[in-house]
């Protein structure tokens, strides 16, 4: 599943 990738993107957005 691409859940990991999606989660990573969400985290980066949150940090920004």
Swiss-Prot record:
UniProt subunit comment: Alpha-beta TR is a heterodimer composed of an alpha and beta chain; disulfide-linked. The alpha-beta TR is associated with the transmembrane signaling CD3 coreceptor proteins to form the TR-CD3 (TcR or TCR). The assembly of alpha-beta TR heterodimers with CD3 occurs in the endoplasmic reticulum where a single alpha-beta TR heterodimer associates with one CD3D-CD3E heterodimer, one CD3G-CD3E heterodimer and one CD247 homodimer forming a stable octameric structure. CD3D-CD3E and CD3G-CD3E heterodimers preferentially associate with TR alpha and TR beta chains, respectively.
The organism's place on the tree of life at top rank: Eukaryota
Subcellular location: Cell membrane
Gene Ontology terms: biological process: adaptive immune response
Keyword Ligase: no
Keyword terms, alphabetized: Adaptive immunity, Cell membrane, Immunity, Membrane, Receptor, T cell receptor
Coiled-coil intervals, chain numbering: none
Full protein name: T cell receptor beta joining 1-4
The protein's role, per its UniProt record: J region of the variable domain of T cell receptor (TR) beta chain that participates in the antigen recognition. Alpha-beta T cell receptors are antigen specific receptors which are essential to the immune response and are present on the cell surface of T lymphocytes. Recognize peptide-major histocompatibility (MH) (pMH) complexes that are displayed by antigen presenting cells (APC), a prerequisite for efficient T cell adaptive immunity against pathogens.
């Amino acid at each position: 599943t691409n859940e990991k990738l999606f989660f990573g993107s969400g985290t980066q957005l949150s940090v920004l």
